[in-house]
């Protein structure tokens, strides 16, 4: 598709999120985020999932679609499999995008997915976030975007490639997703790995898109205010196991890191000048394996044992892995 045709027919996007309780500081920053989406141009369709206090009221105030019922795990955390499936069924956009409900977006986000969608029909767009302390409600009157962007560039901190807060993807990309709990680690890394395994173009939009993450603690979870407590929970351990669904032995043997892709694993970069191949993914792949010599040795041993197995043994091994 040519550049001219992409401006003549701009693809729409369905943004979806699952907010937490609209209480205290979390309530303030979620309202900031969602209101920023409502003023974005081109205008997205917005779907809010879940029945947390305040969600239905925010949806009604801004005229957004609200879906209260979402499948959850035994700890009451929404499952991304159901969120993504419902978003595609209910949304009208040719592009679908999950966004964490504390992320402020600007017009450059919408402009970026238009460019990527014109370039590829099978893609995932991600990008690094900029952390910023925001304690008060944002005033969206006047030139709020210019002022907030200036504050983010001046005072904010660009986060590492492991922090992934939005996923803009072509409709139908994620046809099958395991029962991963949202916000409980590993689920976001798996989404990148899955896109790469499907042969989709994974585009890092960091160089063209500024997204602002409003800093907060983790007191809204049942695990306490620190990430370390949550990572040690049964819920996060289950997420790690589920990322290995195609080969459960990978978790038992400690290889679930093979599915922990980050933004550095993107195949391409979106820049003001265009979309270019990203050589960083090669370095990331090398680093992923070279930093785990023991794991590499185990994988090599496993590969050799499979290649040397007799046909009958291979069949038994295959049945065992199912």
Sequence positions of predicted segments:
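Conserved catalytic core of nucleotide-sugar-dependent glycosyltransferases
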Residues: 88, 104-193
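C-terminal catalytic/acceptor-binding lobe
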Residues: 12-14, 19, 180-322
